Amino acid sequence: MTALSDYFKDLRDIYNTGSAVRETSYYSTFETMTNAYGKELKPRVRCVINLQNKGAGIPDAGFFTASQFQRGENEPRAGQLPERGCAEIKSTREDVLKIAASEQVAKYLEFYGAVLVTNYRDFLLIGKDAHGKAEHLERFPFAESEAEFWKEVRADASAFAAKFETSFAEFIKRVFLHAVPLTKPEDVAWFLASYAREAKEQVERAKDLPSLQALRKTLEEALGMTFRGEEGEHFFRSTLIQTLFYGVFSAWVLWSKKNEADEKFDWRTASHELKVPMIAALYYQVAEPTQLKKLGLVELLNQSNKVLNRIVKQEFFRKFSESHAVQYLHFRNGLNFKHFSVIINRMLLV
């Protein structure tokens, strides 16, 4: 069993009693699920239900790091705020976007800096943009409606969870790490690898999409090889994702050398920095909504773009070496590196 499978089963069991309060009866399932993912991070992140009113109301939950829990006989530190933001939890009947637009969430955002809004079946992370205004950062819905959600969970919670386990785990960990200042290459690599793994999953699910053939041709011509058979198909999809995400990172590295610290990077317009024609061709095809909209790669590249714009450049480049770019951006979980270092080296050429 997995954390998400357990979450769905717990929700189902509480629902099946017929005696549950729509919102609060399920708090424990949210706490258990988020703690299961939080303990995999360093430092660990732990969910605490119902925080004190510090002036903005009583959040349904807050996300604290391990260092915030006082050890030994010392008294707890008074007035601590959760380092990784808070949560606003409503019943499955509520709409996440309407919850997000509420005055209460606005107060939490101003006070805590980040709010995870959820109705147990749909998750939305809200943060602040460069001007301090509310911004919807990432969203993860399990179903389009309350009825559909309960139907799936009650029919087979494990099978339903299996559809989302990897991608949701990546999402919830990104939620916990959103507030962390990005100064280390390995932290940036974690975020980009997280989006890359999710992108690879999406491409795997859409492997029969005819529009992928155009991308295949572009890569085959660039690499001087042909993707054949099942192994070739796997290598093609892995190489596609690596090319896109390494490309966007490499473009950011070169772009950063020429632009002021307060300017914002845009992966769509900065790809020419790489001076690699195949990257420009790939980006054009991926960004073309009529061709590859179903893949969802544009949204994942947009999220990666936001990560790059969060980097504290001066500190980052003190620790970063271009010669180690491939090492820093090691996309695990089945992404093949065969023949790929040549492409990366070309991307980083000024």
Residue ranges and their predicted role:
Residues F30-M33, Y37, P59-F63, G85-A87:
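Central hydrophobic cores of alpha-helical transmembrane segments in multi-pass inner-membrane proteins
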Residues T2-D6, S211-F227, Q327-L348:
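Active-site-adjacent bridging/hinge elements
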Residues M1-L41, V45-N50, G247, D266-T269, ...:
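Charged, often low-complexity linker/regulatory segments
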Residues T24, S28, I99-S102, Q213, ...:
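Conserved structured core elements
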Residues N53-G55, F63-S67, K90-E94, N333-N336:
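Short, flexible loop/turn elements at secondary-structure junctions
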Residues A66, R71-V298:
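Charged, often flexible domain-edge or linker segments that flank or initiate folded functional domains
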Residues K257, A261, H272, I279, ...:
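Class I S-adenosyl-L-methionine
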Residues L41-Q80:
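Active-site metal-binding core of divalent-cation-utilizing nuclease and nuclease-like domains
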